[in-house]
């Protein structure tokens, strides 16, 4: 089943219908079908099958690579369809891995990479690297769990780096070579000279955490310097524009930012209790595009206000909590892992969709589970959830 759906994902790139720059739909007369939605079901089932094997160990490289292939292959194919929203949902499977024993430091590393990427775009490479070094200092201090002269020296060195641009500006005279030296290069030089010292120190003192965090600084610096290349050469033009508008680097209220602006106006105008069913001006008169699909949450906000939005969010939270609670009560590893896959998919859709409608996430086109119009999404989530219900009920019957 997994391979069959994977074949459909590849086929739709060549044979599918292009809708708003994304080639991810098959069209059969009046009916459209999106294989990316069904792929969440097959990926969840195969992931649960692989990870529920008695011989599986999450910290073994061979098993970890197998899991990465199960998740990564459909994710990459969906990205090739220019369906970024659906591909991003697969990143949520990392929560499943975390539940099964995957190190939480990987979650932290992913979050840190996103933060560095944003800081480099919004501020400067110097600020991003400075934040990286500061975070590593702080984490190592917590890991040591005690105050000593080395910690004090590290704090003093970090404060010196914070004021390095100001110090260099004041020290530079009209004929000084400091005028031609950029603080960023000085910071990188200090970091690259210091890192081997900390790696060796960690190795000699059997402090593996110190060595790995020092190497993490190197990886972070490489990411910072790769940001411009990734942003300008790998990302597509519409993706760059959406990120620039989201981060406030550019204003485009009549273009890329139109959907989000109208969505936030609709939600804000709803007030506490909303304008009433079908009484919303922004949605009724069509100011908000895709209001029945990707931006359906703004319809809820305008017609039912803050109270309606809160009720909808709480219903989703209750559903996710109930799936996780039932997964934890399960005696079979397959049911538990599959349940976490279902919860992760729903959470990612909820987080991205609502974040998109209120301007906290870029517009990437992703439906709100069981609420947005669209047969593929509705059927996929229905089957996804009911498979879990069937698995859980079968266990209750036999145990």
Stretches found by the model and what they are:
Residues 1-254, 298-358, 383, 387:
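Hydrophobic alpha-helical transmembrane segments of multi-pass inner membrane proteins, especially
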Residues 69, 256-260, 273, 289, ...:
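Alpha-helical membrane-protein architecture signal
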Residues 83-88, 274-280, 291-293, 364, ...:
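Transmembrane helix boundary and interhelical junction motifs in multipass membrane proteins
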Residues 267, 271-304, 334:
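Long extracytoplasmic/lumenal interhelical loops at the membrane interface
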């Amino acid at each position: 089943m997994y391979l069959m759906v994977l074949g459909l994902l590849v086929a739709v790139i060549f044979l599918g219908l292009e809708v708003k720059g994304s080639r991810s739909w098959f069209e059969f007369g009046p009916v459209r079908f999106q294989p990316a939605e069904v792929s969440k079901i097959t990926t969840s089932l195969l992931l649960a099958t692989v990870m529920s094997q008695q011989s599986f160990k999450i910290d073994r490289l061979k098993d970890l690579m197998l899991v990465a292939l199960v998740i990564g292959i459909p994710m990459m194919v969906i990205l090739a369809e220019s369906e970024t929203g659906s591909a991003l949902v697969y990143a949520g499977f990392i929560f499943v891995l975390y539940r099964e024993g995957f190190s939480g430091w990987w979650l932290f590393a992913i979050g840190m990479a996103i933060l560095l990427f944003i800081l480099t775009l919004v501020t400067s490479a110097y600020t991003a690297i400075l934040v990286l070094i500061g975070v590593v200092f702080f984490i190592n201090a917590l890991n040591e769990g005690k105050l000593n002269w080395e910690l004090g020296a590290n704090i003093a060195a970090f404060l010196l780096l914070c004021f390095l641009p100001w110090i260099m500006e004041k020290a530079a005279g009209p004929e000084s070579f400091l005028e031609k030296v950029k603080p960023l290069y000085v910071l990188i030089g200090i970091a690259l000279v210091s890192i081997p010292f900390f790696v060796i120190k960690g190795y000699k003192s059997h402090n593996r955490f110190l060595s790995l965090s020092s190497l993490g600084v190197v990886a972070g610096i490489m990411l910072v310097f790769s940001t411009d290349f990734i942003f300008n050469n790998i990302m597509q033009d519409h993706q760059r524009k959406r990120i620039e508008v989201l981060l406030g680097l550019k204003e485009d209220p009549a273009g890329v930012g139109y959907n989000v602006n109208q969505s936030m106006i609709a939600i804000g105008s709803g007030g506490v209790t909303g304008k009433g069913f079908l009484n919303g001006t922004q949605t009724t008169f069509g100011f908000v595009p895709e209001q029945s699909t990707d931006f359906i949450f703004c319809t809820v906000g305008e017609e039912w206000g803050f109270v309606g939005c809160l009720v909808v969010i709480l219903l989703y939270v209750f559903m996710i909590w109930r799936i996780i609670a039932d997964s934890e009560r399960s005696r079979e590893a397959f049911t538990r892992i599959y349940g976490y896959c279902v919860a992760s998919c729903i959470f990612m859709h909820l987080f991205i969709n609502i974040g998109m409608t209120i301007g906290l996430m870029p517009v990437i086109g992703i439906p709100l589970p069981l609420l947005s119009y669209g047969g593929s999404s509705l059927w996929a989530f229905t089957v996804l959830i009911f498979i879990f219900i069937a698995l859980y009920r079968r266990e209750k019957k036999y145990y």
